[in-house]
């Protein structure tokens, strides 16, 4: 009887270990890390003019992958890029199609029921992209159409903000930020709601940037982080260790400059974020 019980415990232990085998085991086996990225969310995660993944979050994940080569002692670790959309991004992590989600992902408590998050990677806030000849603030949007990307925390926050302010407006859902820009350019919506840095990038890449502007006020605060599989503590620790080294060593500066511009540097609040978030070994 005791032998049978011991055998059962041994079997359950093996099965438990197998079930909890996470990203690090797969990375070691395949000698590759799979990075999920968006094709339509500049300046954080997008496909550039020559069809390559680019943006701040993508560059940051490349730096994380480089740190993992040192942690795992795998100098030939390769990076595989997995394109995702705003709608499919979390499913890619949950269904084990990607190891790390590298795009402007807002870390929220409700999302932590689906995935785990790294230490913070960025801080942004949502606002309105408006036409220079149109209404310029949220109060002036009553009875008008406001575009927002579908299936995002930004959409939820827009609806909540309108409700709290007692403003009745039509919320127009878009599949991509580019679609929102086109609707605003064509006068089909009065404003487009998204994170400010994304809006600034959209304006810079538009056909007539002088006709567009970003409203002055922040309507939300969005802390970004890298998403990974729920419950994969070993991988999250490895990612957090990599990010902490990047923050504490100052490597985050060149990564930031490459993504935004040669002279750009993190804002004072971002600098504080990186100092606080970078954990010692």
Located regions from the model:
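Extended ligand-binding regions for polar small-molecule ligands
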Residues: 24, 58-67, 134-135, 139-153, ...
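Bacterial N-terminal signal peptides
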Residues: 4-14
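Ligand-binding cleft/hinge of the Venus flytrap
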Residues: 49, 62-78, 154-173, 203-208
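A ligand-binding cleft/hinge motif common to bilobed small-molecule-binding domains
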Residues: 88, 102-114, 157-164, 183-220, ...
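Extracytoplasmic small-molecule ligand-binding "clamshell" domains
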Residues: 25-101
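Short helix-initiation/N-cap motifs at beta->coil->alpha
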Residues: 74-91, 133, 172-182, 220-222
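Periplasmic-binding protein-like
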Residues: 39-40, 121-132, 196, 203-243, ...
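Beta->alpha turn/N-cap motifs
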Residues: 37-41, 82-87, 96-108, 149-153, ...
């Amino acid at each position: 009887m005791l032998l049978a019980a011991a055998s059962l415990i041994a079997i359950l232990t093996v099965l438990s270990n197998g079930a909890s085998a996470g990203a690090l085991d797969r990375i070691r086996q395949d000698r590759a890390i799979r990075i999920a990225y968006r094709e339509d969310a500049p300046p954080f995660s997008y496909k550039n003019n020559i069809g390559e993944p680019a943006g701040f979050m993508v560059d940051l994940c490349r730096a994380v992958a480089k740190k993992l080569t040192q942690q795992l002692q795998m100098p030939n670790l390769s990076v595989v890029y997995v394109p995702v959309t705003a709608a499919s991004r979390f499913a890619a992590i949950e269904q084990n199609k990607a190891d790390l989600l590298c795009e402007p992902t807002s870390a929220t408590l409700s999302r932590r029921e689906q995935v785990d998050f790294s230490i913070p990677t960025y801080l942004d806030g949502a606002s309105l992209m408006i036409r220079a000849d149109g209404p310029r603030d949220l109060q002036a949007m009553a009875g008008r159409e406001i575009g927002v990307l579908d299936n995002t925390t930004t959409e939820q926050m827009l609806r909540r903000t309108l409700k709290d302010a007692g403003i009745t407006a039509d919320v127009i859902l878009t599949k991509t930020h580019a679609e929102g820009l086109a609707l605003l350019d064509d006068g089909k919506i009065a404003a487009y709601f998204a994170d400010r840095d994304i809006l600034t990038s959209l304006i810079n890449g538009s056909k007539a940037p002088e006709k567009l502007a970003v409203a002055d006020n922040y309507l939300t605060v969005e802390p970004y982080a890298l998403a990974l599989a729920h419950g994969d503590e070993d991988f999250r620790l490895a990612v957090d260790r990599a990010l902490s080294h990047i923050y504490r060593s100052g490597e985050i500066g060149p990564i930031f400059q490459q993504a935004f511009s040669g002279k750009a540097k993190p804002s004072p609040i971002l600098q504080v974020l990186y100092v606080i978030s970078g954990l010692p070994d």
